[in-house]
Amino acid sequence: MKKILLTLVFTGVLLFIFAVPRNLVVVEISTGTWCTYCPGAAMGADDLIANGQPVAIVENHTGDSFANVYSNARHSYYNPSGVPTAYFDGLNAVVGGNHTQSMYSSYLPRVTSRFAVPSKYTISATGSLDGTNLNIVATVAKPEADTNTNVLLHCVVTESHIQYSWQGQTHLNFVNRLMLPNQNGTAVSLATGEEQTYNLSGIINPAWNINTCEVVLFLQNNATKEILQGVKYPRWELILFQ
């Protein structure tokens, strides 16, 4: 019995040794400027960043002037029972918010829990911006065996520091503006040890402030909705580090 227990412990240690660290927890929030309790979700997201938590945030607007085909698709994909609803790597939903108080204390435990889960994938990217043409070259690798199938690579352009008066708030952050190449994502099927490069492109609206945009890339099991790995790049970092 002792030998079996030691073997199980050793096997568990090996799994964590060979697993890939999780870069970031992807936090997606279904929200809308018409929603009374959505300020708490927005403040919670802002507080995660302000406190240095390892997150990439995407706010998917629905039913307002910031909603678009991309945010509506993500909202429909999760099909939340109410707004706001926050998802942590596609899982562990927090439904509801607050009109005046941050949801940070509700969000933090879920971030901590997901960040402790190792990944089997890595993602890196470079980019170029030619006028309004944004081109992303994403490299995905699977250094360890993984049982997930139906995996999609999603690439989201978010904009922050948008001055807008809503529900007692003065700005919007992490607004889902664009998904490359579209809201459906790109199929990823890799053998263990394999690496693949994906070219993603789209058109940036010149009305957006490109200097406050981020690019968020993540791999998601389209069936279970679990996000397997996520990274983010500020616009300047993506362009400079080629």
Functional labels for PLM-detected ranges:
Residues 1-23:
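Bacterial Sec-dependent N-terminal signal peptides
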Residues 43, 53-242:
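Short, conserved sequence motifs used for protein processing/export or organelle targeting and
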Residues 20-56:
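Local sequence-structure signature of Cys/Sec-based thiol-disulfide redox active-site neighborhoods
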Residues 3-4, 24, 113, 238:
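Hydrophobic transmembrane signal anchors and adjacent membrane-proximal interface regions, especially
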Residues 17, 29-31, 85, 134:
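Generic hydrophobic/packing signal
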